[in-house]
Regions:
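Bacterial N-terminal signal peptides
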Residues: 7-17
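Conserved serine DD-peptidase/penicillin-binding transpeptidase domain
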Residues: 24-27, 75-330
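Small-residue-rich helix-loop
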Residues: 49-51, 302-382
Length: 382
């Protein structure tokens, strides 16, 4: 009963987006230049209470995450976890490993995320396990292996979004939410971002950031660019490099030498497991990303439903899932899992059907509990 009421409340919020219209339905400023789509259904009475532009494809923005979460929960289940394996590759000679330390990434969007305190300490765990194995030196490098297809910013995202923290993209290896803090006047970053180039510009209008997809050059505009206390948050161009550098430095600081020899090898190639890191459960990740409207994590959960495939295949599987449930997404445009692309289109009634299906499913209590509460928390607190 409680779950059904909760989902009905979500339906109203999910159908609002901007475009053009001469009508005013909700009475907010600027509504005459907006398209408002509404679909409200009383699930207990099985009766549609109100609908307006319910079949119109509207840019959903972050309400796309409601569909992504429903899909991920259905395919993966609430207890699914990403597992990142750390291995030694090469051969052992006493306390020395002749070869590399390899982090086999699985596009876990939560690795060392600040939003999951209980799962922090990845580097420390690797260090402690190597010590327990008696390894004191590694002749090769810390290699971060990535396998995610079409990683990085979604091509249809606006270039102006890429450098800002909300525009953090999903990669094969993700680290610290794929963001960093930069002090432009000094060039210092936290964490250290290898290969980053910063170009500063003075601008009286305020702070602006710009970085092209795949570029390691970040352009920063600001009023007082010489202020050493001024800092900005931006996105990592290559999270795998940041992870590799940080883990290498942590190992060296703990007394485990990493020689960094790219040609380090041995005739006998072996693999030994050092550590397996598990992410939070899918339900925990989904709740966090929905409450905060985290774009990168939404992309990670969408891609998780089709491991080894590209983004289009993940979207195809999502459409097939709902089509099998009698809800066609054929004429709804789905480009990403976060809703950051302006090319996404969802009809309010279609999203309403998805939410209704979830309310009547075995996840009828869990699914609504993942969303932020208006006036209480997350991006709906005020």
């Amino acid at each position: 009963m409680k779950a059904l009421k909760s989902v009905a409340a979500i339906l109203l919020v999910a159908g609002i987006s901007l475009s053009s219209s001469a009508e005013t339905i909700l009475g907010f400023d600027g509504e005459e230049t907006a398209t408002v789509g509404i679909y409200i259904k009383d699930l207990q009475e099985d009766k549609v209470i109100a609908e307006h532009n319910a079949l119109t494809g509207i840019t959903p923005a972050s309400t796309m995450k409601a569909l992504t979460a429903a899909t991920a929960l259905s395919v993966l289940g609430p207890d699914y976890r990403f597992s990142t394996h750390v291995n030694l590759r090469g051969s052992r000679q006493g306390a020395s490993w002749q070869g590399d330390l390899v982090v086999n990434s699985v596009a876990d969007p939560t690795l060392e995320s600040e939003y999951f305190d209980k799962n922090l300490g990845f580097c420390d765990s690797v260090v402690s396990h190597l010590r327990a194995m008696g390894i004191k030196s590694i002749t090769g490098r810390v290699v971060v292996a990535e396998s995610l297809k079409d990683a990085g910013p979604v091509p249809q995202w606006e270039i102006e979004d890429v450098a800002w923290s909300y525009g953090a993209a999903l990669y094969g290896a993700n680290w610290r939410d794929n963001v960093f803090r930069l002090w432009p006047a000094t060039g210092r970053t936290k964490p250290h971002v290898p290969g980053l180039k910063v170009e500063l510009h003075r601008d009286a209008d305020g702070t602006e950031l710009l970085r092209g997809a795949g570029s390691s050059t970040l352009e920063v505009w600001g009023r007082d660019i010489n202020n050493a206390k001024w800092s900005v948050m931006s996105t990592m161009p290559n999270p795998a490099m940041v992870l590799s550098h940080e883990l290498t430095e942590r190992l060296r600081g703990a007394g485990i030498s990493v020689n960094g020899d790219k040609s380090a090898s041995s005739q006998k190639q072996e693999t030994e497991t050092v550590y397996v890191h598990h992410s939070p459960a899918a339900s925990t990740i989904l709740k966090s990303l929905l409450v905060r409207s985290d774009n990168m994590m939404a992309e990670g959960m969408l891609r998780a439903i089709a491991p080894g495939d590209d983004r289009k295949d993940a979207v195809k599987r999502e459409k097939e899932l709902w089509d099998a449930r009698g809800i066609s997404l054929k004429y709804n445009g789905i480009i990403d899992g976060s809703g950051l692309s302006m090319g996404n289109k969802l009809a309010p009634r279609t999203l309403g059907y998805v939410l209704e299906w979830m309310a009547r499913s075995p996840y009828g209590e869990l699914y609504p509990s993942l969303f932020p509460r208006a006036g209480v928390n997350g991006n709906m607190k005020s």
